[in-house]
Amino acid sequence: PVTITIEQPQGAELPLEKTGEWRVATTLTRAGAEPLGFGDYCAANYDELIDHPVELGVFDYEAFDVDGVPHAIAITGTHRGNISRLVNDLKRICATQIRFFEEPAPFNEYLFLLRVVDSGYGGLEHRSSTSLICNRDDLPSANEPNAPSVGYTQLLGLCSHEYFHSWNVKRLKPDVMVTPNLRQPVHTELLWFFEGITSYYDDQFLLRSGVINVDAYAKLLSQNITRHLQTPGRAVQTLANSSFDAWTKYYQQNENTPNVVVSYYVKG
């Protein structure tokens, strides 16, 4: 077992008046700490410890329930987003995914950690949470129409993608990722399945949950197909090789990448 103490930052660089409103957002098990508070947290082992990201600072926090499972979102960064709209849409997406698998959710709670920046996009799945980054303008506006904007649709798709990984990657995973060597890249030929299948379903769950309509989904699907057909590398690299070479090619792109690499997200 691992027990850690998260202390409130102090010192000349971070005077108390600057950190007095700081809170802690994580799904680590509390071992004496109050909800959102500094103090003791614990994990069963090191693997569990590093799979629970921690957000420290001033953030907006909204809790909500999905099929009896506590969920929450912590948003860090200046924004003018309509958080009520975001929470309502997330509830629909999450509920649709849980019911899709026809079994209880594989976690006791879930946390979306969202960092809002001027320009950025991405996410990483964890066993009961996800770390996300998005553009400030991607958040829904106060007068967001029923049909989400392009940026907001992209954000919802990202949330849907990482949430689906709770099943497809965190529960179902390649054998080399069950007990991975964290000192070096771990290679597998199956990323096309774990990322490709997830990418197929992320936007589809926006449709299934009613967050977007059929026309909006068809547009997203056509954009992905067009992106794939316009990539010459689709006729050069196999999905297995694309998966295996992710560390050395897909994430180290150069001017020739489109000619020799195919996306295991899109084609998968």
Across the structure, where does each feature detected by a protein language model lie?
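Preference for long, solvent-exposed alpha-helical segments and helix-linker "stalks"
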Residues: 34-44, 58-64, 69
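Acidic, low-complexity proline/glycine-rich segments
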Residues: 49-64, 235-239
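Acidic/His/Gly-enriched intrinsically disordered linker/tail segments
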Residues: 172-181, 185-266
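Mid-sequence acidic-hydrophobic segments that form the walls
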Residues: 7, 100, 204
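Extended, low-hydrophobicity, Ser/Thr/Pro/Gly-biased non-transmembrane segments
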Residues: 1-53
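Juxtacatalytic substrate-recognition/specificity segment
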Residues: 4, 60-190
